[in-house]
């Protein structure tokens, strides 16, 4: 007994007419009749009652029809699941914070496409907490994110540290300085980032000011780094953010390095523990190769 026998039987059982069933199956009526006889011989009981006027199911045929439908549905589902696995293996979903968009993805994606030309890449801009949750749920293959990572289900690798810089309005009294100390920021109006959205940036900045015995005057909390920089450009205060944001400078702010003890923020690459699909293994390897070539 093969699946084609079940398909032929179901077509006849649903049409209760050999001619219409044969047309639906794109086969001849004699061939269809032969397949049904083979099936009945295999089962060992009649499944259909045939006469010149009609076709009907026997009691055994009624029962067999339900099982045949279930088997065909299971076979179709098995085929779809197998195809889905192959399709998922050929897709890589990458979450990223803005820093990775500027400093990493342009360098590694061309290399990845050369190594995995048939893999579909999906890029998703997400904050760190969203990336961690989606990695844990299997909705994201890899995340380029910040500390902290709370889930024990996730592995991660620190890629590099990015020094923070001072960003000031162009007309700020400190804008003419070549570099700025923590002491110069004591009491200065300051735009902070919301730790819910910025990951470890806000705690790093807070800890640095405490270590340097400097206390800025926080006048605004922003939901992301770009908004923070725009608020600085509007003259609300100064801020500390990674230097890569100078790529988005519209001329309303100036970037100045920090003198002395310079705080930094790490960029991480994170993925779910366990077996990796080939595309993920290649992406991780390419990122590591790229970083090794830069530091060599």
Swiss-Prot record:
Q: The HTH lysR-type domain covers which part of the protein?
A: 1-58
GO terms, molecular function: DNA binding; DNA-binding transcription factor activity
The yes or no answer to whether the keyword Transcription is present is yes
The alphabetized UniProt keywords are: Activator, DNA-binding, Transcription, Transcription regulation
Q: Which residues bind DNA?
A: 18-38
Q: Which InterPro entries match?
A: LysR_subst-bd (IPR005119), Tscrpt_reg_HTH_LysR (IPR000847), WH-like_DNA-bd_sf (IPR036388), WH_DNA-bd_sf (IPR036390)
Q: Which PANTHER family match?
A: HCA OPERON TRANSCRIPTIONAL ACTIVATOR HCAR (PTHR30346:SF0), TRANSCRIPTIONAL DUAL REGULATOR HCAR-RELATED (PTHR30346)
> What NCBIfam families does the annotation carry?
PRK09906.1
Q: What does this protein do?
A: Transcriptional activator of the hca operon for 3-phenylpropionic acid catabolism.
UniProt record similarity statement? Belongs to the LysR transcriptional regulatory family.
Q: What is this protein called?
A: Hca operon transcriptional activator HcaR
Query: Which source organism does the UniProt entry give?
Result: Escherichia coli (strain K12)
